[in-house]
From Swiss-Prot:
GO terms for molecular function: RNA binding; zinc ion binding. Residues 1-20 have a biased composition (Basic and acidic residues). InterPro entries: RING_finger_Z_arenaviridae, Z_RING-type_Znf_sf, Z_RING_Znf. It is a lipid-anchor. A lipid is attached at residue 2 (N-myristoyl glycine). Myristoylation is required for the role of RING finger protein Z in assembly and budding. Plays a crucial role in virion assembly and budding. Expressed late in the virus life cycle, it acts as an inhibitor of viral transcription and RNA synthesis by interacting with the viral polymerase L. Presumably recruits the NP encapsidated genome to cellular membranes at budding sites via direct interaction with NP. Plays critical roles in the final steps of viral release by interacting with host TSG101, a member of the vacuolar protein-sorting pathway and using other cellular host proteins involved in vesicle formation pathway. This is RING finger protein Z. Belongs to the arenaviridae Z protein family. A motif (PTAP/PSAP motif) lies at residues 88-91. It comes from Tamiami mammarenavirus (isolate Rat/United States/W 10777/1964). One of its GO terms (biological process) is viral budding from plasma membrane. Pfam families: zf-P11 (PF03854). A zinc finger (RING-type) spans 38-74.
Length: 95
């Protein structure tokens, strides 16, 4: 299911990355000062999206996009196009 879209994007854009896509990370590495957390709710530490100088989770991003196109924390434009850094995996399909 996910491979079809990836192949279409690859055929359309070649090997270069599509422009305007923000990477979504499944797991963030530990830093010197601890874990990365969502700057809005402070609970989520997986599936974070980088805004201008901080990270926000998908739930907070969706709720902010329902209200306005700008981030309530930093005032920058919120990311709308996402791409996965690692391709999600699924069990093999057997009809």
């Amino acid at each position: 299911m996910g491979l079809r879209y990836s192949k279409e994007v690859r055929d359309r854009h070649g090997d270069k990355d599509p422009e305007g896509r923000i990477p979504i990370t499944q797991t963030m590495p530990q830093t010197l000062y601890g874990r990365y957390n969502c700057k809005s709710c402070w609970f989520a530490n997986k599936g974070l999206i980088k805004c201008s100088n901080h990270y926000i989770c998908l739930r907070c991003l969706t709720s902010m996009l329902n209200r306005t196109d700008y981030c309530e924390i930093c005032g920058e434009v919120l990311p709308k196009r996402l791409t996965f850094e690692t391709t999600p995996t699924a069990p093999p399909y057997t009809p």
